[in-house]
Amino acid sequence: MLWFVVGALFPALLLAAPPPINKLALFPDKSAWCEAKNITQIVGHSGCESKSIQNRACLGQCFSYSVPNTFPQSTESLVHCDSCMPAQSMWEIVTLDCPGNDEIPRVDKLVEKILHCSCQACGKEPSHEGALFNVYLNAEENMPAEGPGPHHYAHHQQEVEEPPASSHHHHEEEGDE
């Protein structure tokens, strides 16, 4: 029975991302770092008025390395890659007014609001598609009959600990899809 459990868990262990590296033996005086920096993000859509919102962007230096291979390979490949990415985020609906468009007078945009960042495996895929779909369904069910105010929906965490202050700008513009 123990061999069955070990045999079932072993492939999952091989596929699991390695933990982030904070120090390297070759550079003992250098450390990885990753933090959420406050920005003003411009949310836009073709034919609509843009809105400025407070958000955060992940910025940092995380370690990656690659050691040359041998053939035939005697050990597993020595390649590692970490990237500064969101560790906690939530989604917010931002409603843009589209004057002069009678068919679509406003557009709702889902914006990822970053709460915290950390060094994580480069190949880590965020599960945004499912989260976006669920957020949109929740928004439709919970949307008041009237009122353009922003609605907050959780992805990983529910509350922003402090409102970000602006010192950097990021512009996001989408055309017709």
Swiss-Prot record:
TM regions (residue ranges): none
- Taxonomic superkingdom: Eukaryota
Say what the protein does: May act as a tumor suppressor.
**Stretch list, region Disordered:** 143-177
Intracellular or extracellular location(s) = Secreted
Key words, A-Z: Disulfide bond, Secreted, Signal, Tumor suppressor
Q: Which family does the similarity line name?
A: Belongs to the DAN family.
| Any one GO biological process | sequestering of BMP from receptor via BMP binding
Predominant location of this chain?
Answer: secreted
The disulfide bonds in this chain are C34-C84, C48-C98, C58-C117, C62-C119, C81-C122
The protein, known as? Neuroblastoma suppressor of tumorigenicity 1
Domain named CTCK is located at 34-123
Entry GO terms, CC: extracellular space
InterPro entries, per the entry: Cys_knot_C, Cystine-knot_cytokine, DAN, Neuroblast_suppress_tumour_1
For molecular function, the Gene Ontology terms on record are: BMP binding; receptor ligand activity
Region forming the signal peptide = 1-16
